[in-house]
Amino acid sequence: MKTLIDMHTHTGFSPDGEGTVEQSLAKAKELGLAAFAITDHCDCNFRYKADHYGDPEALKDGMMYGSGEYAPASIVAQYEAAQHLEGLNFLCGIELGQPLQDIEFAEEIASDKRLDFIIGSHHQNKGKDDFYWIEYKNMDLSQTYALLEDYFKEMLEMCKWGKLDVLGHLTYPLRYIQGDCGIQIDLAPYDEIIREIFCTLIQKGKGIEINVSGLRQKYGKPLPDLGFVKLYKALGGEILTIGSDAHC
């Protein structure tokens, strides 16, 4: 008998999502999911509206501004819906992006007692665009590798901070570098720091996410792929979640 769970989903409270909390819960029940979480975006570096940051054109991902409003609103809506929900193991969640880029805000969200589940994600390096927006074909390959080095370094610091339940989509940039742009990347130069990321998570009793969004995209593989999942397990990791990263 198959047990299906989905621990990474978004609603219209995410700027790039659609639908209501109630619609998501109804669909999860219809699918017979054994566990289900809504994890709307809370990209901490976009806490305020664009004008707060001086130059609203500085970063391309303008839709994400204002997370200080839409993320708490998602938590409220989820919590209220859960009070009269039956027949579904539902976890009120959030996807906490770039927490160390606004640590005060991240601490505030992470301490919300209504939350059952926090995904810690890293979508963009400090002062850079989301990996989704970067023009890799216009860059020297060494620049791409430098971005990835900073990516894993900042991810490690987030894991050391530790106010998360699972690490989201470890290999997120490959969705765009390899999947969309067709640029092949060898992650071997980052083996040591990835091991350190996993060991940090394991020491803190945290898990990793298998984000299956890559299977329905050009990348064609989960994030991370099986090799990294096996490494996490070999190092002593025991906590895995699976998430569709659905935005509707």
Residues of each region from the PLM?
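A short acidic, amphipathic alpha-helical/loop segment
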Residues: F105-A106, L231
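Short, conserved acidic/polar surface loops in the N-terminal third of protein domains
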Residues: Y48-K49, Q101-F105, D129-Y132
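Structural preference for beta-strand elements that scaffold enzyme active sites
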Residues: K2-D6, A35, N89-G93, D116-I119, ...
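Positions that flank functional sites
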Residues: D43-C44, L174, L215-R216, H247-C248
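Acidic-and-aromatic substrate-binding clefts and catalytic sites of carbohydrate-active enzymes
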Residues: F13-G19, G97-E104, R216-P224, C248
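Short acidic/histidine-rich active-site segments
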Residues: H41, L170, G237-C248
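An N-terminally biased module of ancient metal coordination in phosphate/nucleic-acid-related enzymes
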Residues: M1-L100, A110, Y176-Q178, G182-A188, ...
